[in-house]
Amino acid sequence: DCLKFVEREKRRGHTYHGILMDPPSYGRGPNGEMWKFEKEVTRLIQACVEILDENSLFFLINSYTTGFSSIVLDNTLRTMILPNHPNGIVETGEIALPIANRDLLLPCGIYGSWQRK
């Protein structure tokens, strides 16, 4: 699973100049471990922040999990990334599809990013 991969990369001393991720809303590991985005995403983001190189350029996450707002993601990114990488900006928002022949949008998910200034 991705959290184990990131933790292994940290132990090996590997760092990254950018991270792009699309974690699932729900999943089960090979030994019955359960992944729920709402409960685990902060651990995953924190682990990823720990392997971001000091000269990193970007961090991007998107999610199609219902019930997890872009405000929560914004707060999470600001409190986890900016203290270690203050030379960047955080942006979050909603992902939506236009509804044909209507002036409406169908909400699909959220995104969040940090990028170097």
Regions found by a protein language model. Name each.
Residues D1-L20:
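S-adenosyl-L-methionine
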Residues E7, R28, F68:
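Conserved protein kinase catalytic core
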Residues R8-R11, A47-I51, F58, T79:
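Short basic/hydrophobic patches in alpha-helices and adjacent helix-turn junctions
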Residues Y16-P30:
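Conserved proline-anchored active-site loop of SAM-dependent methyltransferases
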Residues G29-F37:
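Glycine/threonine-rich flexible loop motifs
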Residues K36-K39, L77-R78:
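Glycine-rich, phosphate-binding/catalytic loops in enzymes
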Residues E38-E54:
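A short glycine-rich, Lys/Arg-flanked "PGG" loop and its adjoining helix->strand segment in the class I
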Residues S56-K117:
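C-terminal catalytic and target-recognition region of SAM-dependent MTase-like enzymes
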